[in-house]
C-alpha cells in the first residue's frame, strides 16, 4: 500500500518507491522527518576544529543504492518530467545559485523527507 502512495510523486516510480520502502523499513523509527536525510547520507559532511569550519560533500553513509535511486528520481523530476509542481519549481530555482549537481542532491534529500512524511500520513502527493 505504501508503495502506491509513494509513486504519486512525479519522478518516483516502482523502483524508487520499493527501494525507499526497503531502506526505511519502518517509518516510525525516525523521530522527525528530517532525520531521513542523514540516514541516507544526503547531508553535507562537516569538519570543525577551533576556528576552522568546513562543509564537505555529502556524507555517503549507508544506503548507497537508495541514495543513487533517489538521485535518479530527482534527476527525472528536474530534467525529464514536465509536471509543474512546487517541488520542481523549488529545485529549478536552486540551479542558478548552487549548480545542477548540488540542486539534484538537495532535491533528492527533499524527496526523501517528502516520501517519509507521505508514508507516515498515507496521503497521496497533490501537485500545486
Positions of PLM-derived features:
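A detector of single, family-specific signature residues
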Residues: 1-128
Amino acid at each position: 500500500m505504501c508503495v502506491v502512495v509513494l509513486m504519486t510523486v512525479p519522478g518516483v516510480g516502482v523502483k524508487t518507491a520499493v527501494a525507499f520502502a526497503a531502506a526505511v523499513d519502518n517509518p516510525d523509527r525516525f523521530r522527525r522527518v528530517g532525520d531521513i536525510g542523514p540516514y541516507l547520507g544526503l547531508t553535507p559532511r562537516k569538519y570543525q576544529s577551533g576556528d576552522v569550519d568546513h562543509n564537505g560533500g555529502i556524507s555517503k553513509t549507508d544506503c548507497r543504492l537508495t541514495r543513487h535511486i533517489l538521485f535518479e528520481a530527482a534527476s527525472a523530476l528536474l530534467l525529464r518530467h514536465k509536471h509543474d509542481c512546487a517541488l520542481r519549481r523549488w529545485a529549478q530555482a536552486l540551479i542558478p545559485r548552487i549548480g545542477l549537481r548540488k540542486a539534484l542532491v538537495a532535491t533528492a534529500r527533499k524527496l526523501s523527507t517528502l516520501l517519509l512524511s507521505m508514508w507516515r500520513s498515507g496521503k497521496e502527493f497533490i501537485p500545486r
